[in-house]
From Swiss-Prot:
Keyword set, alphabetical order: Mitochondrion, Ribonucleoprotein, Ribosomal protein
Annotated GO biological process: mitochondrial translation
Ribonucleoprotein among keywords: yes
A Pfam entry, by short name: Ribosomal_S16
Subunit structure: Component of the mitochondrial ribosome small subunit (28S) which comprises a 12S rRNA and about 30 distinct proteins.
SUPFAM superfamilies: Ribosomal protein S16 (SSF54565)
Subcellular location as annotated: Mitochondrion
Name of this chain's protein: Small ribosomal subunit protein bS16m
Family the entry assigns: Belongs to the bacterial ribosomal protein bS16 family.
Organism per entry: Caenorhabditis elegans
Location (main, coarse): mitochondrion
UniProt GO molecular function: structural constituent of ribosome
Alphabetized InterPro entries for the sequence: Ribosomal_bS16, Ribosomal_bS16_dom_sf
Entry's Gene Ontology cellular component terms: mitochondrial small ribosomal subunit
Amino acid sequence: MRKLVIPKYYGRPSIGLALFGCTNRPFYHVCVFPDRALGRRYEGNILEQVGTFDPLPNQKNEKLVALNFGRLKYWIGERNAHISVPVLELLGLSGLFPIHPKSFIRAKDNRALIADQQLKVAAEAAEAEKVAQEQASTGAAATSHPQ
């Protein structure tokens, strides 16, 4: 498709995530597209790949990101490329840009989710301990009073 259209008639280039990988195993390439409107799943629409992002945690619970900062600075600075929100989040976490506000919101939600899970586990443990104490007290009462 890129060869059919004259490049000077494209709009502003866009930096975004292109989905690669398999079913239930996403893998993203951080790519430069000639325009925001063109599809992100077609390899023919990619001008340049400037990084990769693996969203699934590995054995050490890390999400791997590889970025070519030199090429990103070129596309952002000299070519005035538009940057998608997910890429802005990655660039904020990598230190090239300030941290995106959406990252703070996501971290707050994750902390609240973990706190809720810990409260549920503590409540279940307290309930189990209470049941065990009741069983122990009824069992002790039954053995101390022979009939």
